[in-house]
Amino acid sequence: MAHDQPLLVVQEALRKCFPVVEEQQNLWQSTLQDCSPLLSSLSNLAEQLQAAQSLRFEDVPALRPFPDLQERLRRKQLEAGDVVLDKLAERLATLLKVRNTINSHVEQVFQAYEQHAAVLDIDTVLRPSVVSPSVADMLEWLQDIDRHYGSSYLKRKYLLSSIHWGDLASIQALPKAWDQISENECQTLVSDVLVSVSFFLEEPGGCAASGDLEHHS
């Protein structure tokens, strides 16, 4: 079985990585859900600010005794908006941690593969077994997942960094723009991969054993 050792090392790295992907995917999804009401709050504040700007307070008799009311109202609304932006920044930091954690674990898998690539039989790398996709497929899927999180994070970071109170229309459109990022992505990528590797994760050593049996059958 010594000739199987390099394959076993790579498979073990894969088995450690996919559960991390699943855990981080759950954190990613819950964080995105946390962002939705915050984005709606910002959108509503922008709508209120726009309504207040279009109202001529001096034309309302009941408001004339309060000449600074419009400015005080605007300040309060902007302060409330800044509180929401701070909360969104915290959620964005969590998304960055997810992206970095997945990237780090994917890199570890590829380091394990590259360290043993010279002695790995290419047919073994390309061949699936009864319980496992091929190592080549699983490596490709991890690359896809890593790119997915990297791209999604950058799009969301760019969207939030573009917020400024001088463009109230864009702030009102934030919830739709945020959701559009998800709609443009393959929303089942990670879950589909996790289903595909589920038996592999449940059968430690199963792939090497199966491959060995195929050699000797």
Curated annotation (Swiss-Prot):
InterPro entries: CA109-like. It is found in: Nucleus; Cytoplasm. Disulfide bonds: none annotated. GO terms for cellular component: cytoplasm; cytosol; nucleolus; nucleoplasm; nucleus. Keywords: Cytoplasm, Nucleus, Phosphoprotein, Ribosome biogenesis. GO terms for biological process: ribosomal large subunit biogenesis. Phosphorylated on serines by CK2 kinase. Its main location: nucleus. PANTHER family: AFG2-INTERACTING RIBOSOME MATURATION FACTOR, SIMILAR TO HYPOTHETICAL PROTEIN FLJ20508. Part of the 55LCC heterohexameric ATPase complex composed at least of AIRIM, AFG2A, AFG2B and CINP. Does not associate with pre-60S ribosomal particles. Part of the 55LCC heterohexameric ATPase complex which is chromatin-associated and promotes replisome proteostasis to maintain replication fork progression and genome stability. Required for replication fork progression, sister chromatid cohesion, and chromosome stability. The ATPase activity is specifically enhanced by replication fork DNA and is coupled to cysteine protease-dependent cleavage of replisome substrates in response to replication fork damage. This is AFG2-interacting ribosome maturation factor. The lineage of its organism: Eukaryota, Metazoa, Chordata, Craniata, Vertebrata.
